[in-house]
Regions:
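Long, His/Glu/Asp-enriched segments that create or flank divalent metal/ion-associated functional microenvironments
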Residues: 132-190
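Hydrophobic alpha-helical and helix-loop surface patches within well-folded domains
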Residues: 1-153, 157
Length: 190
């Protein structure tokens, strides 16, 4: 059950720190997202909590253990903010190095550091095969004010960062927190 998170924890800080030390561009996670997307569409996905010996296919296991774990960690940065995610990883290492943590221990550290409730994220991402999918449902103007309606298509709720681009080329970011979080990530647009 912990294999995917374990792989992500081992990979994320190591690659980030190495790339900073060597002055290399940040890691592109697109291959992990693509692998996960293909697995989700394939019908072979199983919850990450499935014991490694009990997966119905090697394909499902390998993507869950590596790519889906990497996506979990990258999305955690989206939920709590990338800087906060990095602080979570450092604190988790400090508290749990040379010990035997479980997935709940990681989430407890993440909640303590971020001040955000994260059980919902772990439950959906690790224990189910539900997906995240939103779309712009409609746009309209009301009393000179533009309105946007978003629609959740997938079954995993997420906070939303929505960037609007105006006719003059300027942009503005809007953040819609999720009520399950009982908090919000720091403003990352400064």
């Amino acid at each position: 059950a912990l294999q995917g998170l374990r792989e992500a924890l081992q990979r994320n800080p190591t690659n980030k720190n190495l790339k900073e030390a060597l002055d290399i561009a940040p890691e592109d996670h697109s291959s992990a997202y693509l692998s996960y997307y293909n697995l989700a569409k394939s019908g072979f996905e199983e919850p990450m909590t499935t014991h490694s010996d009990h997966y119905n296919s090697n394909y499902g296991y390998s993507i869950a253990a590596y790519s889906k774990g990497e996506v979990f960690m990258e999305q955690l940065g989206y939920i709590v903010g990338a800087d906060t995610r990095d602080k979570i990883l450092l604190e988790y290492y400090k508290q749990w190095r040379f010990k035997h943590p479980n997935a709940n221990d990681f989430i407890r550290v993440a909640e303590d550091v971020s001040g955000i409730q994260l059980d919902w994220y772990k439950e959906y991402w690790v224990n189910t095969i539900k997906t995240i999918d939103y779309k712009i449902d409609s746009l309209w103007e009301e009393n000179g004010v533009s309105k946007i309606r978003l629609k959740r298509i997938g079954h995993i709720p997420m906070p939303i960062d929505l960037q609007l681009t105006f006719k003059d080329g300027s942009t503005e970011m809007f953040y819609v927190p999720l009520n399950l979080m009982f908090g919000a990530k720091p403003n990352e647009n400064n």
